[in-house]
From Swiss-Prot:
SUPFAM superfamilies: Mss4-like (SSF51316). It holds the Pfam family TCTP. This is Translationally-controlled tumor protein homolog. One of its GO terms (cellular component) is cytoplasm. InterPro entries: Mss4-like_sf, Mss4/transl-control_tumour, TCTP, Translational_control_tumour_p. One of its GO terms (molecular function) is calcium ion binding. The keyword Cytoplasm applies. Residues 1-177 form the TCTP domain. Involved in calcium binding and microtubule stabilization. It comes from Trichinella pseudospiralis (Parasitic roundworm). It is found in: Cytoplasm. Signal peptide: none annotated. Belongs to the TCTP family. Keywords: Calcium, Cytoplasm.
Length: 177
């Protein structure tokens, strides 16, 4: 399994147990599902729960939400639904990413391509009809403010509305488990 951790906060943001695609070499889009499950239960895509599980008949607390958000304990950050706050955040976050890319020895050509592709991505997010539908989440750790936002958008996929979790590729560390 591959875990995607935030480059700056170290928080686990997603894993390869969810269908994903890379867009424009800058954004991973993970397809999640809206789920209802026992509080704290983690269900991996393709897992087969045991038929032998014993039910003691006790009342259980349930939770509902996006499986990716629940599995990785992401925290909703509604303040970023204010477009000005989001713009300020993305501007500062981009500066940090570019500085990190430079310190890691990335070529100027690579950095320029990244900036161009990110500009296109951010411009598409900021369209009023689209931006007002987005949800924002951060990692659960104490350094979450240092990291990136997981941006969620609901889209029609095969006749059902599914949550798409968007993460900036260059802001992730890939960890094999």
């Amino acid at each position: 399994m591959i875990i995607y951790r935030d480059l700056f906060s170290g928080d686990e943001l997603c894993s390869d147990t969810f269908p994903m695609k890379l867009v424009n070499d800058v954004v991973f889009e993970f397809t999640g599902k809206h789920v209802v499950r026992k509080l704290g239960e983690v269900t991996l895509e393709g897992a087969n729960p045991s038929a032998e599980e014993f039910d003691e008949g006790t009342e259980e607390q349930m939770e509902s939400g996006i499986d990716i958000v629940l599995n990785h304990q992401l925290m909703e950050m509604p303040m970023y639904q204010d477009i000005k706050i989001f713009k300020d955040w993305i501007k500062e976050y981009m500066k940090k990413l570019v500085e990190k890319m430079k310190s890691d020895g990335e070529s100027e050509e690579s950095i320029s391509k990244f900036k161009k592709n990110m500009q296109e991505y951010v411009t598409s997010l900021l369209k009023k009809d689209r931006f007002k539908e987005l949800q924002f989440f951060s990692g659960p750790g104490e350094n979450a403010a240092e990291g990136q936002l997981a941006i969620v958008e609901y889209r029609q996929v095969s006749d059902t509305e599914q949550p798409i979790v968007m993460l900036i590729k260059q802001g992730l560390v890939v960890e094999k488990c």
